[in-house]
Amino acid sequence: MSTPITLPQGMAITGEIKPGYEAILTPEALALVAALHRAFEPRRQALLQARVERTKRLDAGERPDFLAETKAIREGDWKVAPLPADLQCRRVEITGPVERKMIINALNSGADSYMTDFEDSNAPNWTNQIDGQINLKDAVRRTISLEQNGKSYRLNDKVATLIVRPRGWHLDEKHVTVDGQRVSGGIFDFALFLFHNAKELIARGSGPYFYLPKMESHLEARLWNDVFVAAQEAVGVPRGTIRATVLIETILAAFEMDEILYELREHSSGLNAGRWDYIFSAIKKFKNDRDFCLADRSKITMTVPFMRAYALLLLKTCHKRNAPAIGGMSALIPIKNDPEANDKAMGGVRSDKQRDATDGYDGGWVAHPGLVPIAMEEFVKVLGDRPNQIEKQRDDVQIEGRNLLDFQPEAPITEAGLRNNINVGIHYLGAWLDGNGCVPIHNLMEDAATAEISRSQVWQWIRSPKGVLDDGRKVTAELVREFAKAELENVKRSVGGNTQPYERAAAIFEQMSTSEGFTEFLTLPLYEEI
C-alpha cells in the first residue's frame, strides 16, 4: 500500500509510494520539480521539435558543419570558470547505475570520481529511480551501507568524488505529471538530487556535480544552464555551485563543442568523449545516406578516422577553454578463470588509456573496479603528480568538418558481427525489461548505447547497398530473422531462469531492425513497458 504524501497543486504521481519514498518525495522537493517543469517544459518541447526538423533536413541530404552564426564564440578568448578543488583531478572515473552495492563499491574503488547513473546504465523503472535517490542521499551523508549474502558493505574513509548523470532531454518521467503533462526525466532526477544534497555536499567541501547526456546542440546546453540558475536560486545556493560535464555523444554536438562550453561556462567541468552513443548517433543521423555504411562494431575503434578526429577536437577545445577533457569508456571487464583472455582484455584497457593520456586527456572512464589500477597507472605515467594536463594545448590539431564525417571503415561486415549485434541486442534489452540496465555480456559491461548501436547497424545493413557480408551474402530482413531465432536460443541458454523478457526483447529487436521506419531511441517505446 502506498504511503500518503502531500503533492503540490497540479501534480499527480502514479508510482507506488513505498515506505521511505516520502523522505525523497517531500512537498518542498516536489515543488521544485513542479516549478522547473512550468518554467522550462515549453522550451524542452521546442528543442525536441527542433531535433525532428533537423533530422528531416539531414534525411534530405544536408550535412552538418560548424555554425557560421557562432564563429565569434569559437574564435573568442574566453575560459570556463575555475574548477572546484575536488574536480581538478579526474584521472580515472568509474561509472555505474544508482544501485546500492554499486554505489558503495564504486566510491571505494580508488577512482578519483564516480559517475552514478540514472541514465543509460540504469533501467528507469519507478523503483530504480526513487531507490537511487535514497541511495545517493545516504551516500552523500556517508551513512550508506548494505548487508547482502553474508557480506557487509560500508564506505571507506576516502571515497571518489560523486557526479550524477540524470536522464537526457528526450526522456519523460511517466509516473509524474504537472498540469496533466509528464515531467522531464532529467529535471526530475536533477531536481530531487539537488534539493536533498546540494547544501550537504557544500558543507562537506564538495558540491552538486552532474554529467549531461545526449545533447545535440548548444541551445540544449543553454536550457540546462538556465535550469541550473533557477534551481540554485530556488534552493538557496550560490550561482556557479553546480558543475556539469557534458557528454559529447552525438555527432551534431561535435560541431558545437565550443558553443556548449560557452553556454555552460559558469557551470562547466568539461567534456567527455561518449564513444558508443557517438557511433550510434552517426548511424542514426545519416541513416538515409545510401553511401554511408560502417563495418562490424568491433572494427569501429577510437583510431578510425572519424572517431580520431572527434577525440582530438574535443581535447583541443576543452584545453583551449581551461576545461578538463575526459576520455571515453573502457567497457572491458576482468575475465575470471581464463588468464590468457584476461591478459588480452586488460592489455586493451591499458593501450586505450595510454593513448588517451599521451594525447593529452585528463582522465578516462572504466566500468569495473578491477580496471581502476590499470587505468590509473597509465595516467600517472604521463601526469606524474599533476592533477591534470589542461595546460597541454593541442594547437597542432587542425580538424575540419569533413574530418568528422570521414566514415571509415566500411568493411568487413561479417556473419559473426551480425550475429553478435543481434545476440547482444536481445540480451541487453531482455535485461533492461527485467529492470537491469548495466549488463556484463561477452566480457564487456554493456549499457543502452550497445543495444542502440546493435539495432541501428542491423537496420542500416539491411537498407544499404553496401550491407553485404564478407562472404558475399546481402544482409536482409529474412537473414536477420533467421539469425534472431538462433541467437534468442543462445541468450536463453546463457541467462537461464525467467526467459520471458528475452522473448519480448527478441520481438522488439527484430521489429526495430527490420521495420521501414527508424525508431529515434529504443528506450522510448520500451519505457512504456516497464
Feature-to-residue mapping (PLM):
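Expand to "…catalyze enediolate/carbanion chemistry for C-C bond making/breaking, isomerization
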Residues: 2-530
